[in-house]
A protein has these predicted regions:
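Extended recognition/assembly regions associated with phosphoester-bond processing machinery
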Residues: 1-78, 82-214
Length: 214
């Protein structure tokens, strides 16, 4: 895995964007990401659609590399940790997570996070709510116009279309505006929305090896 980074300053705080679909907040020592959709592959297999199990394994391997690199004290998921409740993929995720018991685990719930009391205990969550506020930043799955503070959000799975001489290329991105930082979906097993993006923003587009502002 090639890790490329680019710093951006928001409200006098340094955030590190990565080409591996995650964000690091230096001051808070927090690794931040959105839309893992754990359980999506198992859900499809259960419904008769054959998918390789390596999809989620690859996501977790990337996450492990990010944890080893940044050494976070907090792990913040800005919604859609899960895709379809409890299944075998969730068991695998919990086994993976147990090796990082020293990291506090914060879940901002998304529209897919249907979590029972039993599943809350299984996931060993340190925090679970619809919003998380740290200093002047609010973490919420989907942008909320009623919130005055700067919002860090997910949900959209943002992407951008670039035109080359041969074809159009769709790439994931971060989008930063005056009051929002929109995160890409962490899982690679997701689509891209290239239309419903915040207006007037800066786009940080990335590939497997690079990240650039455009």
């Amino acid at each position: 895995m090639n890790l490329a980074t680019k710093n951006t300053t928001i409200q006098n705080e340094i955030f590190t964007l990565t080409n591996q679909r995650a964000l690091f907040w230096k001051k808070e020592k927090a690794l931040i990401l959105s839309d893992l959709h754990i359980g999506k592959t198992a859900h499809f297999r259960k419904n008769g659609i054959a998918l390789a199990n390596h999809i989620m394994k690859n996501d977790l391997e990337r996450l492990s590399i990010l944890i080893e690199y940044f050494k976070p004290e907090k792990f913040i998921v800005v919604g859609d940790l899960l895709h379809a409740g409890d299944n075998s993929d969730v068991d695998e995720f919990c086994t993976w997570k147990n090796q990082y018991s020293n990291i506090k685990f914060y879940l901002v719930e998304g529209n897919h996070d249907r979590i029972s009391k039993t599943l809350v205990q299984k996931l060993c969550l340190d925090f679970r709510a619809n919003q998380l506020k740290i200093n002047d930043f609010v973490f919420v799955h989907d942008f909320d116009k009623s919130i005055e503070d700067f919002q860090i959000t997910g949900h959209i799975h943002p992407g951008i279309v670039l035109n080359s001489a041969v074809k159009k290329i769709r790439l994931p991105c971060f989008v930063q505006t005056e009051n929002q930082l929109l995160l890409p979906a962490f899982s690679e097993f997701t689509g891209l929305d290239t239309k419903n993006l915040p207006k007037g923003g800066r786009f940080y587009v990335f590939t497997d090896s690079e990240i650039h502002e455009i």
